Amino acid sequence: MVINSVLIIIRSKLNTLQGCPDPSQCQLLNVNRDTLFSFHEVSEKFLQQMVALYVASHYKNSPDDLQLMSDAPAHQLFVLVPPIAEDSKHLPEPLCVIQVALEGRISRESVKNSLSRGKRAAGDLIPWIVSQQFQDEEFAGLSGARVVRIATNPDYIQMGYGSKALELLVDFYEGKFANLSEDVNGFAEETITRVTDAELANASLLDDDIKVRDIRKMPPLFSKLSERRPDNLDYVGVSYGLTQPLHRFWKRASFAPVYLRQTSNELTGEHTCVMIRPLGSSEDIAW
């Protein structure tokens, strides 16, 4: 039971809203991972709700997913929440969770070396797939965001929350929430506390001091999209096991297929499909 609690393996019970808010009234918030994994009671409760959505909406989950969520350097977390009253003192219920991995900006030399050897480095899934399949040395130099997971509360499936969360995510990366009158120093930046190699070499589980961090010294758990500076991206993409409902979902969000694996996955029997959506206007897209 202790291991289950630490790794949040046991599925938490999902809350049920009193009524269903209109998707147009919901907002997408950025989640600060440093605060989310601070061991504070409030943050821990929300983390359990997020993991519960993951477990309820996907056939395969493991502690590795939790590790990626916590400290993968290029990952970002977003949650779609119902309207929040200004005087509310309660955590909002997550209707949908989106986990994103930033990819790309691979040097042309690295692409050439990998293509010549028929191998690719770990990570940067979509850039490497497109580069290998199309023998394209330019695409990997672009910057993109890959949707790793998008999980909606199973009680609210087919109600438009996933589509709304994805729409707001694309709007964020296109800079539609940016306030041009704001000073750049006013943006909230996520900082993940990391240890050095020297600290790891001298560390020991016997003398580790694991404790709840002072919540007063932590950044807010949530940030509005208008408070975050979006990364300068060229596209948003996704890689998933092809099914008719999933293809319909991504196509409706204006994603276009660029790759379909010829052989099926041994575990699921599905064929991997990669779809992307360019960001910005068509006049700005040179590729």
Where are these regions (language model features)?
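Conserved acetyl-CoA pyrophosphate-binding loop and the N-cap/start of the following alpha-helix
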Residues: 156, 160-165
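Terminal substrate-recognition subdomain of acyl/acetyltransferases
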Residues: 1-61, 68-75, 79, 85-94, ...
